[in-house]
Amino acid sequence: MSLDGIIGQCEHADRPAVTITFDDAFENLLEHALPVLSEHQAPAVIYVPTGHLGKNSEWDHGSAHPLMPIMTAADVKNARSMGFEIGSHSRSHIRLRGLSAVTLQQEVCDSKKMLEDLLGEQIRTFAYPHGGRNDFDGRAADVVKEAGYRSAVTTFFGRHNDPSHRYEVRRIIIWPGDTTHELQRKIDGHYDWLAFKEIAVHNVRTATGRTLAR
């Protein structure tokens, strides 16, 4: 099932639905993740920064994160042929908050068109680059909606249970050190309180004129 379908049924489903999302379209997904997910028929969405196809994760330059190879256009087509949904992760992987109207349109719309031309189908979902509360704003969300996307995901922590907020979809981040027990607790909602803490911290910092560096 597509992410859009899961969002649409989340309010009335008899049991929780889960999909897996991958930001950045790292090349190593093809070797380490997609074959396993395909074997178990597990749905997943891969969010592609179209301006970096066949390059490295240059946005991590100067950070503690190593530069990672990004899928090529052929890799993206291969992933789609395996049954995985493809979404846009903008063109340049830059923060959308505060961009000019022209640049914002390029980041949101040009990436959508490039993927649609590549795959021959509509691209229905978008992932905000970096995805935090200070990384995009209402203007960006409006452009995403007007471009024809049906949903947009953030890095706001938590389970998503409100289909009316389809342009601010929450996600549960899984870290490399998480155990199976911790993963189950996250899915069951034991860490939902972190979402309220995240909102409170953002509101305090906004009220005091500070921004959270990401």
Where are these regions (language model features)?
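Metal-dependent polysaccharide deacetylase catalytic core of the NodB/CE4 family, i.e.
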Residues: 15-18, 38-134, 168-169
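Short, glycine/acidic-enriched loop or turn micro-motifs at the edges of active sites
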Residues: 26-27, 92
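Hydrophobic/aromatic pocket-lining and membrane-interface residues
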Residues: 23, 37
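C-terminal active-site subregion of NodB/CE4 polysaccharide deacetylases
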Residues: 1-21, 27-28, 98-214
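Alpha-helical segments flanking ligand/cofactor-binding loops in enzyme cores
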Residues: 35, 77, 141-142
